[in-house]
From Swiss-Prot:
Protein name (Swiss-Prot/TrEMBL): Probable glucan endo-1,6-beta-glucosidase B
GO biological process assignments: cell wall organization; glucan catabolic process
Native organism: Aspergillus oryzae (strain ATCC 42149 / RIB 40) (Yellow koji mold)
EC number: 3.2.1.75
GO cellular component, as recorded: cell surface; extracellular region
Length: 406
């Protein structure tokens, strides 16, 4: 008997569905609306990229308005501007990049989840003030944002996007442009654990954080299991211990525990489950960008076929926490790939990815908005272009994957 991958995944979903917001904890808006009913419990969300960890390529105009033009990362910009000037500049950004109106718009598009990337420096007690340069004051804006999202009925994932010492080299998403990844040592792990404990206290004691159901303990570690050995043997088990220790001290009921998310084994940093002795409410994350996968033939048919058949996760339950409609730099402005003259292809590719990712626990698009003047990295612009439907169940009405089995 031939057992399909979809059949196996559906069986697993039946066995492990208890962790979902609709099952162990009803999440509703202030007027009682459950946004998960329309998605049958699947996560459908967007990342709030560049709100608290600025990636200059996403919004070069806003980066320049901060006074950061020519700087690689927040660390570099704060060092250039000076602490007081940087604090004032970033406060204006935090107050304007994602607003209450953005949250209303996200909800109106049929989405039910936001993922908020943050850096460890949001807990300002963890900053080495004599050698680290990050903007101060972000937490008040995070709390306000989570309050808006909770009122709207959105599920919230807080993601440790920027880890102490930087989890990868030369990438602004860590908050700095470090020459080498410095995260994978005990004292940096300890700083990250202190951040997770601090964040857990905030989530369970402040009303605005009531819809935060998941903490991701580090975003996109190095894709090399040899480099990340202690991440798996030390940091992941201790992250569970630290979060549960706080929840125990606060007498939190087990059904209200935070889900603890790690990068899935398919990410390439090894099996996150390898050394766990406690995996209660564990969750996993993978990021899928065909743009950077040299194994995939760069053709429209190949992209849709790959997305239809992609094995995107090895652990369960998994969320595809970042993905986009981005294509390789050397073809993205050619006739076959330009965004506004190839709407039909991008509609189908979006549908293929959603259909695949909802065989798991769902997806979170990267990102909500950009200043790129096109939609391949901007969910908001994708809706306005007609590539992304506001009725997300519509992507299942036309089977774009029919006849495209691997």
């Amino acid at each position: 008997m031939k057992v399909t991958r979809l059949a196996v995944l559906n069986t697993l979903a039946t066995l492990t569905v208890a962790w979902l917001p609709t099952t162990d904890k009803t999440i509703t808006s202030s007027n009682g609306t459950d946004l998960f009913k329309a998605s049958h419990g699947k996560i459908r969300g967007v990342n709030l990229g560049s709100q608290f960890v600025f990636e200059p390529w996403i919004a070069t105009k806003a980066w320049s308005e901060l006074g950061c033009e020519g700087q690689e990362s927040e660390f570099d910009c704060v060092m250039k501007l000076g602490q007081d000037a940087a604090n004032k500049a970033f406060a204006k950004h935090w107050d304007s990049w994602i607003t209450k109106e953005d949250i209303k718009e996200i909800r109106s598009y049929g989405l039910n989840t936001i993922r908020i990337p943050v850096g460890y420096w949001m807990n300002e007690d963890l900053i080495y003030h004599d050698s680290e340069y990050f903007p101060h004051g972000g937490f008040a804006y995070l709390e306000k944002l989570c309050g808006w999202a909770s009122d709207a009925g959105l599920y919230i994932i807080i993601d440790l996007h920027g880890a102490p010492g930087a989890q990868v080299a030369k990438n602004a998403f860590t908050g700095q442009f470090a020459d080498t990844p410095g995260f994978y040592v005990d004292f940096q792990y300890q700083r990250a654990l202190e951040f997770l404990e601090w964040m857990t206290i905030k989530v369970h004691t402040l009303h605005n954080f009531r819809n935060v159901g998941m903490l991701e303990v580090v975003n996109e570690p190095v894709q090399n299991p040899q480099v990340t050995t202690t991440l798996r043997s030390n940091y992941y088990p201790n992250a569970f211990h630290s979060i549960r220790k706080v929840e125990g001290a606060l007498s939190i009921d087990r059904k209200d525990y935070l889900h603890i998310q790690m990068m899935d084994g398919a990410w390439g940093a090894g099996d996150p489950h390898e050394h766990l002795t406690d995996d209660y409410y564990a969750a996993y994350d993978n990021h899928r960008y065909l743009k950077w996968d040299p194994r995939v033939e760069v053709s429209k048919d190949s992209y849709i076929k790959t997305s239809c058949n992609d094995n995107v996760a090895t652990n369960w339950p998994a969320i595809i926490g970042e993905w986009s409609l981005g294509v390789p730099d050397n073809v993205q402005e050619t006739a076959d790939w330009k965004p506004y003259s190839n709407l039909d292809f991008y509609q189908k590719w979006f549908a293929a990815q959603v259909q695949n990712y909802e065989q798991h626990q769902g997806w979170i698009f990267w990102t909500w908005k950009t200043q790129l003047d096109e939609y391949r990295w901007s969910y908001r612009d994708g809706v306005k272009a007609g590539v992304i439907p506001t009725d997300l169940n519509a992507v299942f009405r036309e089977d774009v994957c029919k006849g495209r089995s691997s």
